[in-house]
Amino acid sequence: MNSPAIVIIIFSTLTFSEAWVNDWDGALNFQCQLKDSIKTISSIHSNHHEDRRWNFGCERTLRDPSCYFTNYVNDWDKLLHFTCKSGEAIAGFNSYHDNRREDRRWKIYCCKDKNKCTDYRTCAWTGYVNSWDGDLHYTVPKDYVLTGVISEHDNHREDRRWKFQHCRLKNC
């Protein structure tokens, strides 16, 4: 009998379901540990709540960073288009949801190592990584860091689609 395998699968499922950073309609506040930046992004959408739950994974990419949160980078129902400054990587997100507007406003946590610059020749934007109301899964390619996000909102679907920018960092 394969009962240990069944227990592991059930445990894995329970662990994953509890891994969301935010609740439906709740605040989101996530920062990678010092010296890490965002490596993976996952999200699911609920038509009932007209909101997304989010999860992030991090990877060691920085040595001695200085970090800051931006001001809000989008208005309700408007385009979000943001890139960190040269040499910076995205290491966190902060947002809150408004039930009347069924949207989120976002702040982004950028971190920079001294003497690091963005190698703009290596930068690339993804296409949209999720469909309206669909799951979102994105992994930053090996040896790259997450540097930018684009998101558009649709008032009929009350959801956002997302694109991400990744770049390599180089010594300045």
Swiss-Prot record:
Subcellular localization(s) per the UniProt record: Secreted
Keyword Signal among record annotations: yes
Disulfide bonds: C32-C58, C67-C172, C84-C110, C111-C117, C123-C167
Sequence repeats: 21-25, 50-54, 73-77, 102-106, 129-133, 158-162
UniProt keyword annotations, A-Z: Disulfide bond, Repeat, Secreted, Signal
Pfam families, per the entry: DERM
Chief place where the protein resides: secreted
Signal peptide: 1-19
Protein's job: Possesses the property of inducing both aggregation of amebocytes and agglutination of erythrocytes.
Family the entry assigns: Belongs to the dermatopontin family.
Name of the featured protein: Hemagglutinin/amebocyte aggregation factor
Species per Swiss-Prot/TrEMBL record: Limulus polyphemus
